[in-house]
Amino acid sequence: MADSEEQEDYKIQGFDADIQNLLKTALKEPGSVDLEKAANVIVDQSLRDSTFSREAGRMCYTIIQVESKQTGCTMFRSSLLNRLQVEYRNRKETRARSLQEWVCYVGFMCNVFDYLRVNNMPMLALVNPVYDCLFDLVQPDSLKKEVEVDCLVLQLHRVGEQLEKMNCQRMDELFSQLRDGFLLQGGLSSLTQLLLLEMIEYRAAGWSMTDAAQKYYYSEVSD
């Protein structure tokens, strides 16, 4: 029963049996499996599956915590960060190849940033790479693609406040570009304009939204 709950909890039922066993063991006894392989499996699936990428940060956090507690090692975290660094360096090629893979990567990076902690603080090593990805998403070409705007808004809702606390200057620069795109760039869809305006007001209100504003924006989106 516990296995089936865990499988469902972390949405690993789509993997073949060997990979499911690898991940389930990594979650319980990480010292007994190939953690570099486990990290690569999680990243590979996160780049293909946006639903899984939203879960994966929590899974990575669990494996890191259990490994630290049981063995005192950080093999999984090192393997994960090494692989994320490779994907970060290749992000332009990823975007050119597949927008879906690109937004999955950004979502996964932000999810890992959201969950991973060192001394109860976000990992400094991830702050600038996450910012760089968000800056990519406010470029004029990206603002013309609703899938990228959706990703930008979703990730800023998730980690914007944390990122600002880690580096306020870069958040100011990001929102300066976002505002310029909203005010000056032609050819944006009405949905994109609505989402960008909502995000500008969301940050201006201290990363929060009144009930009235939420009803307004989301009734407009649903229309």
From Swiss-Prot:
Places the protein is found:
Cytoplasm; Nucleus
One of the GO biological process terms: cap-dependent translational initiation
What main location does UniProt list? Answer: cytoplasm
**GO cellular component assignments:** cytoplasm; cytosol; histone mRNA stem-loop binding complex; nucleus
Does the record bear Repressor in its keywords? no
UniProt keyword annotations, A-Z: Cytoplasm, Nucleus, Translation regulation
Q: Which GO terms describe its molecular function?
A: RNA binding; translation activator activity
Q: Name one Pfam family in it.
A: MIF4G
All copies of the MIF4G domain together span 9-206
Similarity comment text for this entry: Belongs to the MIF4GD family.
- Role this protein plays: Functions in replication-dependent translation of histone mRNAs which differ from other eukaryotic mRNAs in that they do not end with a poly-A tail but a stem-loop. May participate in circularizing those mRNAs specifically enhancing their translation.
How it assembles, according to the record, is:
Interacts with eif4g1, eif4g2 and slbp; probably tethered by SLBP to the 3'-end of mRNAs ending with the histone stem-loop, it also interacts with eif4g1 which is bound to their 5'-end.
**Full protein name:** MIF4G domain-containing protein B
Native source organism of the sequence: Xenopus laevis (African clawed frog)
What is the organism lineage in this UniProt record? Eukaryota, Metazoa, Chordata, Craniata, Vertebrata
Q: Gene encoding this polypeptide?
A: mif4gd-b
